[in-house]
Design a protein with these regions (language model features):
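The feature encodes the CheY-like receiver
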Residues: 54
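Short amphipathic alpha-helix used as the core "switch/output" element in two-component signaling
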Residues: 59-71
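Acidic catalytic/metal-coordinating carboxylates
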Residues: 31, 57-60
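C-terminal output/effector regions of signal-responsive regulators
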Residues: 125-204
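Two-component/phosphorelay signaling modules centered on CheY-like receiver
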Residues: 9-30
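Alpha4 helix (beta4-alpha4-beta5 surface) of REC/receiver domains from two-component response regulators
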Residues: 60, 80-98, 105-109
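Acidic, metal-coordinating helix/loop segments flanking the phosphotransfer/catalytic sites
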Residues: 28-46
Length: 204
């Protein structure tokens, strides 16, 4: 079982498809609080933790799990910022997955090489390189959540987090229109562009 701690539904869907291709089952937690509730009940084989989460830094959870006993077999940090690779390893992660998750064979090989010997698949391993194409509905869901958050935000720090979330999701989806829209300085203009894109996806 793989637990992913990630607030983007689109990125989680990409991970779910990769796990499906790999014969693994994925569970999702969208925050540190949700992850801790999950870990109180389940003990996953692998946990993938986004460094930037709505209620705090994923590095904190990585550090907690790395020092826990018994220890989860594989702890991975993930981020759209490659500089977080070093920070994740420093916190105690076994490895790092860069976003967006696009290459299935890279996803599989990263996990396989870190699995404890007793948990590695027996026999020859054929890495797959099938395309991973998450449903656009999950991308729309992320845009809707970002739009709601932008309209309710209370501080520049919250605005920065929402823009960072949008940047990660739009890069993962390859949406050039939205990647350009994020550069808009005014909140009302950005909200209008998000609403426009949501409407376009609904028509598809």
């Amino acid at each position: 079982t793989v637990l992913i701690v990630e607030d983007s539904r689109f990125i989680c869907e990409a991970a779910r498809l990769m796990c499906l291709h790999s014969g693994a089952r994925l569970r999702r937690a969208d925050s540190l609080a949700a992850a801790r509730r999950h870990l109180n009940v389940y003990f996953p084989t692998i946990v993938i933790i986004d460094v930037g989460l709505p209620d705090g830094s994923g590095l904190q959870l990585i550090s907690e799990l790395a020092g826990a006993s018994p220890r989860i077999g594989v702890i991975l940090g993930t981020s759209g910022d490659d500089l977080m690779n070093h920070q994740s390893l420093k916190a105690g992660a076994d490895g790092f997955l860069a976003k967006p998750f696009e290459n299935l064979s890279c996803f599989q090989s990263t996990i396989l090489q870190l699995l404890p010997v007793e948990q590695k698949p027996k026999g020859p391993i054929v890495l797959q390189d099938a395309p991973v194409l998450p449903d656009l509905i999950t991308f729309r869901d992320d845009l809707v959540q970002a739009l709601i958050s932008l309209k309710d935000y209370l501080s520049s720090k919250e605005e920065g987090f929402i823009r960072s979330f949008l940047a990660r999701v739009c890069a993962a989806s390859g949406d050039d229109y939205m990647q350009e829209a994020i550069k808009t300085g005014y909140i009302d203009q950005l909200c209008a562009k998000i609403e426009h894109r949501i409407g376009q996806i609904a028509i598809l």
